[in-house]
């Protein structure tokens, strides 16, 4: 599920996550998510399976699929894989080979939003107040990271469905803050944030990109090549 349900009796809503985590355990023990919402749900459900015996018992009983699962899978975000498995230094070297890198010297602001960092005790993704992983990624792409106050604040999330005006106000605060600090564009790792930042921008607008889009641009990978 794309939303983590906090009620302890909401077992059924988390079974798809448990099933994915269990399958990953049986196929190498690691699960990488490109989407921050998916990452958030998988990481939190995995923690539930490891720390909440009652929930784990109910989930395993419902699934009734071979060996019980108790949170053994390591859940990673795509950014963590790029940093810790491939290495930002390796990416930076490959980027330098692209002499026509359109990102070189460009001022780009990282937008973290909520789901990558919170709840911090479970996510353990980065410093929840002063994260650096996306800024380090921006540097590896040959661009210049712009740090601004609203980068960790909520864009409105799913509230855009019921209260578009509120989401527009949130996005305006983010966009104006980033632009004031010199950002020429924003980069995010959350599809919902990407949608909100693009669709709910009103007075202040900046180009907004997904992490994989700018990675491809920096490496000189064309769209038709990426589809192969």
What are these regions (language model features)?
Residues 1-228:
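Iron-sulfur cluster-binding electron-transfer modules in prokaryotic oxidoreductases
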């Amino acid at each position: 599920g794309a939303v983590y349900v906090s009620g302890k009796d909401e077992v059924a809503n988390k079974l798809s996550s448990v099933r994915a985590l269990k399958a990953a355990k049986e196929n190498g023990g690691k699960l990488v998510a490109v989407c921050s919402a998916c990452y958030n749900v998988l990481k939190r459900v995995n923690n539930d399976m490891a720390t909440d015996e009652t929930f784990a018992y109910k989930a395993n009983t419902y699934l009734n699929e071979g060996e019980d699962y108790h949170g053994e899978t390591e859940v990673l975000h795509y950014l963590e894989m790029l940093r810790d498995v491939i290495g930002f230094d390796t990416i930076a070297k490959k980027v330098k080979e692209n002499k026509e890198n359109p990102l070189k010297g460009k001022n780009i602001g990282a937008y973290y939003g909520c789901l990558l960092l919170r709840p911090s005790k479970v996510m353990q993704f980065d410093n929840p107040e002063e994260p650096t992983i996306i800024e380090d990624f921006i540097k590896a792409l040959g661009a210049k990271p712009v740090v601004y106050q609203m980068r960790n604040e909520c864009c409105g999330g799913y509230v855009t469905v019921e209260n578009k005006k509120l989401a527009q106000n949130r996005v305006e605060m983010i966009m104006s803050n980033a632009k004031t600090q010199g950002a020429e564009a924003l980069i995010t790792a959350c599809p919902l944030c990407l949608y909100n930042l693009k669709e709910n921008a009103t007075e202040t607008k900046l180009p907004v990109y997904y992490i994989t889009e700018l990675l491809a641009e920096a490496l000189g990978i064309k769209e038709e090549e990426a589809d192969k």
